[in-house]
Amino acid sequence: MGLPWYRVHTVVLNDPGRLISVHIMHTALVAGWAGSMTLYELAVFDPSDPVLDPMWRQGMFVIPFMTRLGIKDSWSGWNITGETVINPGIWSYEGVAVAHIVFSGLCFLAAIWHWVYWDLDIFCDERTGKRCLDLPKVFGIHLFLSGVACFGFGAFHVTGLYGPGIWVSDPYGLTGKIQPVDPAWGAEGFDPFVPGGIASHHIAAGILGILAGLFHLSVRPPQRLYVGLRMGNIETVLSSSIAAVFFAAFIVAGTMWYGSATTPVELFGPTRYQWDQGYFQQEIDRRVRAGLAENLSLSEAWSKIPEKLAFYDYIGNNPAKGGLFRAGAMDNGDGIAVGWLGHPIFKDKEGNELFVRRMPTFFETFPVVLVDKEGIVKADVPFRRAESKYSVEQVGVTVEFYGGGLDRVSFGDPAIVKKYARRAQLGEIFELDRATLKSDGVFRSSPRGWFTFGHATFALLFFSGHIWHGARTLFRDVFAGIDSDLDDRIEFGAFQKLGDPTTKRQVV
């Protein structure tokens, strides 16, 4: 046929059988990738430390999505919370992966069958004997079936009526677990951080989809609308389908990057805004103050801070810190976190507490500055020692740790104090193992960053595709070169290929 590579899809025009075939093959590829990628991730995933080396630090991509839907067990005898599992069954990581691979194989065979047996009677119009698809009816069928699936997910799976529920956690990502969720039908259901909205919105959208599907199955579009929206053209279907996909991609890119109940911190890592706003730092400070109010010592108050919460308050877990084009997991960058060293409290020689100014997200280097409680600079690590006025040595800064591995250990050596001041720029201080993975010390992004980048990029591409194909189908006659002064009223290209010379033209 001599088609260029970017027009090979022309072969499925006016060929419903092979159009179905290529769609089934696409489903086979998607399901096969999902199953295969899951098995690969399971082969390299280390579940031994869910607190300091969670899935998102290891660069897992599909495992977090499976976990948020209620899968937590592995055939290898572990589950995502670190417990031992005896008989995980089919509802496990490997079970679902194998099911996807088997489904992929069946779709592959079905695609071949439909490619070979493409000219089926069901695709022929009884009136004309030509191949065609009743696209409004196909739309109604798809809408109805997707509505049933949407309603079923919200009403049964999420609520736990017939299913495990979904991953639900507290606002600070500490107590997450899989549990049933009651639908939230009030205004709180529109809060993106309320899990109940997931159930209620799927139920509502499912009911709407079912009703809309039944409507489109039972009511035919008026001729003026059918012609005006080019409902008989398969490229119209392509354009509107691309619109649905790019719209969904933009939505999920937003919920992933800004955070929501569908993207828990425990599964995808913190958002950049939680670092920018000092979200976890404020919660840690609140807990310490509460401990001191209960007459606990500083050491006791800081020792009660969960290591998980302290780890979130570390810039290395900020997805915007890694750069989009540094390949690999977070562990390949700054290393595998081994333990929390504790919270450093800096003081000058008069005993006044000093606070290290934290590094903003988009800085690779940042001056080490220590300020007092009023925000006034009291000490620093100078760039030029000859002009220094506030150096650690001159001010006599010391550091003492509370909580963690260095609890109640203090240092007065300026070199050591400066080392910990530099590390305090990055949030809470952790011991990091760079030897095991030969980590290079350069921050990486989390799966949250990769997902957002990928979906936002493809959403823009698909938006362009929607405009392109929408314009082609709406202005098909113009692009095909049909004169506006045709004598006969014809719908060009309804059954003929583009540029059919037999179409009658008569200049008035």
Swiss-Prot record:
Annotated gene: psbB
Summary of subunit composition and partner proteins: PSII is composed of 1 copy each of membrane proteins PsbA, PsbB, PsbC, PsbD, PsbE, PsbF, PsbH, PsbI, PsbJ, PsbK, PsbL, PsbM, PsbT, PsbX, PsbY, PsbZ, Psb30/Ycf12, at least 3 peripheral proteins of the oxygen-evolving complex and a large number of cofactors. It forms dimeric complexes.
Biological process, per Gene Ontology: photosynthetic electron transport in photosystem II
SUPFAM superfamilies, per database record: Photosystem II antenna protein-like
NCBIfam families in alphabetical order: PS_II_CP47 (TIGR03039)
Any one GO MF annotation of this record: electron transporter, transferring electrons within the cyclic electron transport pathway of photosynthesis activity
Designated name of the protein: Photosystem II CP47 reaction center protein
Role, per record: One of the components of the core complex of photosystem II (PSII). It binds chlorophyll and helps catalyze the primary light-induced photochemical processes of PSII. PSII is a light-driven water:plastoquinone oxidoreductase, using light energy to abstract electrons from H(2)O, generating O(2) and a proton gradient subsequently used for ATP formation.
Entry GO CC: chloroplast thylakoid membrane; photosystem II
Cofactor comment text: Binds multiple chlorophylls. PSII binds additional chlorophylls, carotenoids and specific lipids.
Family of this protein: Belongs to the PsbB/PsbC family. PsbB subfamily.
Membrane spanning residue stretches: 21-36, 101-115, 140-156, 203-218, 237-252, 457-472
Keyword Kinase attributed: no
Localisation: Plastid, Chloroplast thylakoid membrane
Entries under Pfam families matching the protein: PSII
Record keywords: Chlorophyll, Chloroplast, Chromophore, Membrane, Photosynthesis, Photosystem II, Plastid, Thylakoid, Transmembrane, Transmembrane helix
Membrane topology: Multi-pass membrane protein
